[in-house]
Amino acid sequence: MARTKQTARKSTGAKVPRKHLSSKSSFPSKPVNEVLKKTHRFRPGTVALREIRRYQKSSDLLIKKLPFQRLVREIAQEFKTDLRFQAAAIEALQEATEAYLVGLFEDTNLCAIHAKRVTIMVKDIQLARRIRGERA
């Protein structure tokens, strides 16, 4: 197919209604019940269990590196300005942080199960921290 040069067309500024060449549409219309196709939905809890298995298999970090690094620098700024961090130091902090959070959520889940619930709540986290001796 040969390329052709496009020339500028003068615009009138007003919208002109388009002319319909044929009264019938080019594709056959479907009945109403075929048009609205239901999207597939998994049963409640299926996707959550799949995510649990996926994250338990993996060993990579779950918190994004740059936001965590910014948070560390922001907290360190309160104690001393112009601090520098090695990449390995921030990575070690992130490993320790994620290990702590995973352990806390495991204990929190046990507290929720003890209360005959499956949903964790703030009071479960508070109880887990209190039992650990982190909070008076």
Curated annotation (Swiss-Prot):
Modified residues annotated as N6-methyllysine in this record: 5, 10, 19, 24, 37, 80
Keywords: Acetylation, Chromosome, DNA-binding, Methylation, Nucleosome core, Nucleus, Phosphoprotein
CDD domains from the UniProt entry: HFD_H3
GO annotation (BP), single: cellular response to UV
Post-translational modification: Acetylation is generally linked to gene activation. Different methylation states of H3K4 mark distinct developmental phases. H3K4me2 is associated with euchromatic regions. H3K4me3 is a mark of active chromatin. set1 is responsible for all mono-, di- and tri-methylation of H3K4. H3K4me facilitates subsequent acetylation of H3 and H4. Methylation at H3K9 is linked to gene repression.
PROSITE patterns in UniProt: HISTONE_H3_2 (PS00959)
Gene name in the database record: H3c
Function: Core component of nucleosome. Nucleosomes wrap and compact DNA into chromatin, limiting DNA accessibility to the cellular machineries which require DNA as a template. Histones thereby play a central role in transcription regulation, DNA repair, DNA replication and chromosomal stability. DNA accessibility is regulated via a complex set of post-translational modifications of histones, also called histone code, and nucleosome remodeling.
Sequence similarity: Belongs to the histone H3 family.
GO cellular component: nucleosome; nucleus
GO molecular function annotation: DNA binding; protein heterodimerization activity; structural constituent of chromatin
Modified-residue entries (Phosphoserine), positions: 11
Modified residues (N6-acetyllysine): 5, 10, 15, 19, 24, 37, 57
Keyword Phosphoprotein attached: yes
SMART domains reported in the protein's UniProt record: H3
Subunit structure: The nucleosome is a histone octamer containing two molecules each of H2A, H2B, H3 and H4 assembled in one H3-H4 heterotetramer and two H2A-H2B heterodimers. The octamer wraps approximately 147 bp of DNA.
Positions bearing N6,N6,N6-trimethyllysine: 5, 10, 37, 80
Domain of life: Eukaryota
N6,N6-dimethyllysine modified-residue sites: 5, 10, 37, 80
Protein name per the record: Histone H3.3 type c
Positions of the UniProt region annotated as Disordered: 1-30
Organism: Dictyostelium discoideum
Subcellular location: Nucleus; Chromosome
